[in-house]
Amino acid sequence: MRALITGCQGFIGKNLAEHLKKQGHHVTGIDKKLKVGDPVYVHEFIGHDMESTITIENDFDRVYHLSADVPNSKGVGGSQLTTGRSNPIQTIQAMDFAAKNKSHFIYAVSAMIYNTEYQGHNGPDLNEDEHIWPAQPAGNIYGMEKLYNMQLAIEYAKAYNMKIALPIFHAMYGPHCDILVNSKVVAAMCVKIIQAEDPGEIEIWGDGTQIRSFCYIDDLMIGLDKLIENDIQLPINMGSDEAITMTQLADMLIKISGKKIEKKYLPAGPAGCMRRNSDNTKIQKLTGRKPNYPLVQGLENTYQFIKDQLTEK
């Protein structure tokens, strides 16, 4: 099997490349450029801006489209305008290439597509059939364009008789995560704890009661395989079944660190929605997929990876 990964140098792209290579597949990757000293995880790397037409002559059995500009609450990454303009163009370029080559197209959907009215303190576990529509995704443009691109992929599949997979990613974490520039919740908290004095203190945005379910990266890889093996072409959650608060997450990581650290809450900080938890009923029913990695095991692996990375730097 020959696979093409867009955004191959990102967190998920690196893990996916390693996963596919271990299975014996040939992996080609596309990204804008290599960072100095950044290893390549694919067999063949192509420097390319995904806003431009893909002109690769090779045929691919699968196209995994991970490339995206992601604005975040710290102002790092693309602006709202950059995200709203760039990501649909990138996705159309990837889908045009997949349609032309009759490739199985796997599009990385975000849990930010879910209607925000269901993400309050007493909100339900989010499922694909009841909580996406009517459309009211997260307040920034990223959730909106992800929802638009998901629907566009469905239309491409109809028009070009193209196989698709639409995994909805819920708070992924694990080795190869970004730790200093565009870090997500788990990685950012690991960095804070590792860099804190002992005894010391870390800051937590919000009041600590925000709830998330974090999915370990290896569980995502298994889930992607299951979607393709079972030819599931519906939007489908990729999450874990362990929902925890930010305070609980901090306590688990502090325990892993072995340090004595106090928590300082910043209620005025960007806390995000109050509750976003994945309902995994559909994927379990259709594919039998269940998360294999308990949260504590995934956090231990991730904490050690980040600690090693910071030590090397």
Where are these regions (language model features)?
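Conserved beta-loop-beta element that borders a ligand/cofactor-binding pocket
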Residues: 109-110, 150-175, 198, 203
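NAD(P)H-binding glycine-rich loop region in Rossmannoid oxidoreductase-like domains
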Residues: 47-88
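C-terminal substrate-binding subdomain of Rossmann-fold SDR/epimerase-dehydratase oxidoreductases
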Residues: 195-313
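Flexible, glycine-rich beta-alpha linker
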Residues: 113-116, 141, 165-186, 211
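Active-site helix of classical SDR
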Residues: 141, 145-148
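Conserved Rossmann-fold NAD(P)-dependent oxidoreductase catalytic core, especially the SDR/UDP-sugar
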Residues: 92-141
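N-terminal Rossmann NAD(P)H-binding glycine-rich loop of SDR-like oxidoreductase domains
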Residues: 3-23
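SDR active-site strand-loop-helix element
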Residues: 6, 30, 63-69, 105-111, ...
